[in-house]
């Protein structure tokens, strides 16, 4: 058995206490074998965690990883105008090679900032799955289906592809890839199609992921057309259950919060994107108080504009307090749990905690920095002070993805150069 020892540091335990300990992981099973006193464990390989904090690998619960190619392309617009005037015209020109290049860039960015698992919505999912496999990460992937603006044949083709991709790729990358059926949103997929295809997904035991209640402009048309709130409409169709998680959930009322809790439907909160697009402030503390599982996602780099989950934790805590008008709301420990254990629960992975038997997904934070001094409360630092660039090592499934800030699973320079070339070509094609 090949074992990796993470030694010399402090460890964040599942109850959010911090203790000095070593962590031993099996590189055969990909699990944590032991967490014990310093000097009591031995491994075949070691990672030095001196002056560091060992934390669970972060979980990006909602993103569009290949949209790194659109980073900085269009800013300072509301969601609908941004999508229709800038994003969708460029996305129409995307090739499979573009998406692979953008995905690799995004995965490198995540590895460098301690993220080990992600939930992605996009196209050319086989390319993204291959990139995830090479990266050694975990992911929930799916093909995002849209029916608006399409004839019946094209609409059905989209939804069939979403089902087929989910069936085909589930369990890829030695089980590190899971899949979801992905109708884009309640306003971009017609009711007749949802009523036909959602039961097929449920019959195949596929989880479901979609955008919901992101902006007021998504809520009003559904209320006007169907006479009920969006999540009540979704529940009527059969979309809400314990294997469904929605992205955003910004404009939800009390009845919808109760409905999410009753059905076991989770929420991927994307605070930076919601702020940048002026979509609104999600009532995260109300969701948590009701028992809803809430994870954190970056959304795409085009609306964020990075994939740093530490930035996202800080944003989630800040905007959560504003939304609740309560400085004690969405506290430091809560956002750390949202970015780790809660995110893992949404995605269905046995990770998000440093504990014997859990997936060996972890990151080591270098605490030897001015902005992390003094160390009164390391959980506070994780939520409010740590940057992605403070990550020293990243491990997923027991394998070292980054050692001493050097990514080992990709040629980072080549990935960056290739992504830049594809981005330039993409924008040029879209402008023709």
Curated annotation (Swiss-Prot):
GO terms for molecular function: 5'-methylthioadenosine deaminase activity; metal ion binding; S-adenosylhomocysteine deaminase activity. Its cofactor is Zn(2+). Substrate binds at residues 91, 184, 214, 299. It catalyses: S-adenosyl-L-homocysteine + H2O + H(+) = S-inosyl-L-homocysteine + NH4(+); S-methyl-5'-thioadenosine + H2O + H(+) = S-methyl-5'-thioinosine + NH4(+). It holds the Pfam family Amidohydro_1. Its EC number is 3.5.4.28, 3.5.4.31. Binds 1 zinc ion per subunit. Zn(2+) binds at residues 62, 64, 211, 299. The keyword Zinc applies. Keywords: Hydrolase, Metal-binding, Zinc. Belongs to the metallo-dependent hydrolases superfamily. MTA/SAH deaminase family. Catalyzes the deamination of 5-methylthioadenosine and S-adenosyl-L-homocysteine into 5-methylthioinosine and S-inosyl-L-homocysteine, respectively. Is also able to deaminate adenosine. HAMAP family: MTA_SAH_deamin (MF_01281). This is 5-methylthioadenosine/S-adenosylhomocysteine deaminase. It comes from Haloarcula marismortui (strain ATCC 43049 / DSM 3752 / JCM 8966 / VKM B-1809) (Halobacterium marismortui). The lineage of its organism: Archaea, Methanobacteriati, Methanobacteriota, Stenosarchaea group, Halobacteria.
């Amino acid at each position: 058995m090949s074992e990796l020892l993470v030694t010399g540091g402090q460890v964040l335990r599942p109850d959010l206490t911090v203790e000095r300990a070593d962590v031993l992981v099996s590189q055969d099973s990909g699990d944590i074998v032991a967490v014990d006193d310093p000097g009591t464990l031995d491994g075949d390989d070691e990672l030095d965690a001196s002056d560091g904090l060992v934390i669970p690998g972060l979980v990006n619960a909602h993103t569009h990883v290949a949209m790194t190619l659109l980073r900085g392309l269009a800013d300072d617009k509301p969601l609908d105008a941004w999508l229709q005037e800038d994003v969708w015209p460029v996305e129409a020109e995307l090739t499979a090679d573009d998406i692979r290049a953008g995905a690799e860039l995004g995965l490198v960015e995540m590895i460098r900032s301690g993220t080990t698992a992600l939930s992605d919505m996009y196209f050319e999912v086989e390319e993204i799955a291959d990139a995830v496999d090479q990266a050694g990460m975990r992911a929930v992937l799916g093909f995002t289906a849209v029916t608006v603006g399409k004839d019946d044949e094209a609409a059905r083709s989209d939804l069939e592809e979403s089902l087929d991709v989910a069936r085909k790729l589930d369990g890829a990358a030695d089980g590190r890839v899971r899949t979801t059926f992905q109708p884009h949103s309640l306003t971009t997929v017609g009711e007749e199609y949802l009523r036909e295809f959602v039961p097929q997904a449920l019959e195949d035991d596929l989880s479901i992921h979609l955008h919901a209640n992101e902006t007021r402009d998504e809520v009003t048309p559904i209320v006007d057309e169907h006479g009920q709130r969006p999540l009540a409409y979704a529940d009527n169709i059969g979309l809400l259950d314990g294997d469904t998680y929605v992205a955003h959930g910004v404009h939800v009322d009390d009845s919808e919060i109760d409905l999410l809790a009753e059905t076991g439907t989770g929420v991927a909160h994307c605070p930076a994107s919601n702020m940048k697009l002026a979509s609104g402030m999600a009532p995260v503390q109300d969701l948590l108080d009701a028992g809803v599982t809430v994870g954190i996602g970056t959304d795409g780099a085009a609306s964020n504009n990075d994939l740093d989950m530490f930035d996202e934790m800080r944003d989630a805590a800040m905007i959560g307090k504003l939304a609740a008008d309560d400085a004690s709301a969405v506290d430091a420990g809560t956002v750390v749990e949202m970015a780790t254990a809660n995110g893992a629960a949404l995605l269905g992975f046995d990770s998000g905690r440093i504990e014997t038997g859990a997936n060996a997904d972890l990151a080591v934070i270098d605490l030897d920095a001015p902005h992390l001094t003094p160390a009164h409360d390391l959980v506070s630092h994780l939520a409010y002070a740590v940057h992605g660039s403070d990550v020293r090592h990243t491990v997923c499934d027991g394998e070292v993805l980054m050692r001493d800030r050097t990514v080992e699973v990709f040629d980072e320079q080549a990935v960056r150069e290739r992504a830049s070339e594809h981005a330039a070509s993409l924008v040029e094609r879209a402008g023709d």
